[in-house]
């Protein structure tokens, strides 16, 4: 293990001791963050509590589909991570348990609001602003300036040079559409998306695929959460990031307890641990740079400071509603996805 991971293990163990979280048993978790983050949490929690952790990695859209599929007989106890909109949809559909953590006052306001908006059926665990990633070598080779705004992405020099995900499968891409609708108004947002379409080479299934393509030199620009760009830069790839000057949205990565899951008490113990400062160090240990929701977690300088960028007043309750999500995605599929380039 790296030194950071060892320190994280020690901090998490002390947290577990102070919270009296030692217990045998089992907890079944769907994890919608990066694989190493999931694995670190699973390993440390299992070692220090004796609890058997069954961890399955799924994207947020797939996770919501699984919870719906098994709602008559839930197999899952906890859903950790992924964009907050699907968690709000799960809450709306009665798939998750109302649970008000005593640690809520320690969390940032945006994490508390996520809990309140869901009637305490989910909670925010991290914040990640939306922006652009770009390959610095490709920009230099093509004598292009890095995009600084949503408007810049429409420039003809970026024709076929942009990748973004498909909002039907990606929370990242849905966050982009919802952000543009709130920033521009719905009609102008869809005019923008149609104008952007010729510049998009492909709509990927995964929200992280575009920035990985930019890192490998397969595309010049990605629409991504900026923390995913930072991860690629830390791993040595020639990428940079920016948040658009007109304003942008952010994901509130969330955590939910599944209603009528097989191990509800074990789920509550894990949930409480995952909200502690010790439990929130695993993202950074896995080279992930979202802002943790617990205010007592030291902020790494590589994390984007929300106070230093132009964030819109994103309406998570409205755009996290199932009907609104379905409507906007259906409109995008009809008007944008299959339009001529």
Set out the residue ranges of the language-model regions.
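Periplasmic-binding protein-like
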Residues: 192-197, 203-204, 235-259, 295
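A bilobed periplasmic-binding-protein/Venus flytrap-type ligand-binding module shared by bacterial periplasmic
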Residues: 133-138, 178, 252-264, 282-283
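Early extracytoplasmic/lumenal segment of secretory-pathway proteins
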Residues: 24-89
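Short beta-strand->loop
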Residues: 97-106, 122, 151, 237-249, ...
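A ligand-binding cleft/hinge motif common to bilobed small-molecule-binding domains
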Residues: 85-89, 215, 220-238
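Mature extracytoplasmic/periplasmic domains
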Residues: 258-316
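Conserved C-terminal helix/tail region of periplasmic/extracytoplasmic solute-binding proteins
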Residues: 315-341
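Extracytoplasmic ligand-binding site segments that recognize negatively charged/polar headgroups
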Residues: 33-39, 75-218
């Amino acid at each position: 293990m790296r030194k950071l991971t060892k320190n994280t293990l020690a901090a998490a163990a002390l947290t577990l001791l102070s919270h009296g979280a030692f217990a045998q048993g089992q907890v079944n978790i769907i994890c919608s963050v990066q694989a190493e983050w999931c694995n670190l949490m699973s390993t440390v929690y299992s070692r220090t509590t004796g609890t058997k952790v069954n961890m399955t990695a799924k994207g947020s859209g797939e996770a919501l589909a699984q919870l719906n599929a098994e709602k008559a007989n839930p197999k899952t106890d906890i859903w950790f991570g992924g964009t907050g909109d699907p968690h709000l949809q799960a809450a709306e559909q009665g798939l998750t348990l109302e649970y008000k953590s005593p640690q809520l006052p320690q969390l940032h306001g945006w994490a508390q609001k996520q809990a309140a908006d869901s009637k305490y059926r989910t909670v925010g665990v991290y914040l990640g602003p939306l922006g652009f990633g770009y390959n610095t070598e490709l920009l230099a080779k093509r004598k292009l300036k890095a995009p600084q705004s949503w408007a810049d992405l429409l420039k003809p020099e970026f024709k076929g040079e942009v990748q973004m995900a498909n909002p039907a499968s990606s929370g990242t891409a849905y966050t982009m559409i919802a952000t543009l609708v709130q920033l521009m108004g719905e009609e102008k947002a869809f005019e923008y998306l149609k104008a952007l379409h010729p510049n998009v080479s492909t709509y990927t299934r995964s929200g992280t695929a575009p920035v990985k393509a930019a890192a490998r030199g397969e595309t010049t620009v990605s629409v991504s959460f900026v923390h995913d760009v930072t991860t690629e830069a830390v791993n040595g790839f020639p990428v940079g990031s920016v948040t658009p000057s007109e304003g942008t949205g952010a994901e509130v990565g969330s955590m939910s307890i599944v209603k009528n899951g097989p191990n509800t008490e074990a789920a509550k113990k894990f949930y409480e641990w995952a909200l502690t400062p010790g439990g929130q160090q695993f993202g950074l240990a896995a080279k992930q740079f979202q802002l943790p929701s617990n205010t007592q977690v030291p902020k790494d300088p590589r994390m984007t400071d929300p106070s230093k960028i132009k964030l819109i007043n994103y309406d998570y309750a409205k755009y996290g509603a199932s009907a609104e999500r379905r409507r906007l995605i259906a409109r995008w599929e009809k008007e944008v996805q299959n339009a001529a380039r």
